[in-house]
Design a protein with these regions (language model features):
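Conserved mixed alpha/beta catalytic, RNA-binding, or beta-rich assembly cores of soluble enzyme
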Residues: 2-28, 46, 50, 83-85
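C-terminal edge-of-domain segments
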Residues: 56-118
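Generic serine detector
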Residues: 7-8, 18, 30, 37, ...
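Short, hydrophobic/π-rich interface segment
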Residues: 36-64
Length: 119
């Protein structure tokens, strides 16, 4: 299984291409991130890769997130240990098209929801 490291500076299109290639070849890829910005880039990369795979291979993806400890051997005195996130991305059979899952069909306003609940 290929292991990819993602930072806040990772280019989404390149990450998506790498994810798609690894899924086509091996059916699985591991993505490691530290920090919210890096996680954001990783999720965007998975979304774009999912489109690539749906368009040319009729494949979908599943994601299994887990917390992982990051090596603390380089921490200076007083620094806290860091926890990262590992995303295991696997090939999955397509059940819904990405448009059905991710597109917003109508705008929902908070006031409309609250009005419905109060009736």
């Amino acid at each position: 299984m290929q292991a990819l490291k993602v930072s806040s500076q990772t280019v989404i299109q390149k990450l998506a291409g790498s994810i798609a290639i690894n899924i086509r070849n091996d059916g699985i890829v591991s993505i490691t991130v530290v920090g919210a910005s890096a996680l954001n880039q990783a999720i965007k990369g998975i979304i774009v890769a999912r489109r690539f795979l749906k368009d040319d291979g009729n494949m979908d993806l599943s994601v299994q997130p887990t917390f992982i400890p990051i090596s603390t051997e380089f921490l200076k005195p007083g620094e806290q240990a860091v926890t990262g996130i590992k995303l295991i991305v696997k090939k999955a059979p397509i059940e819904e098209t990405p448009e059905e899952i991710s597109s917003v069909k109508q705008e929902t306003k908070v006031n409309d929801i609250l009005d419905t609940k109060n009736k």
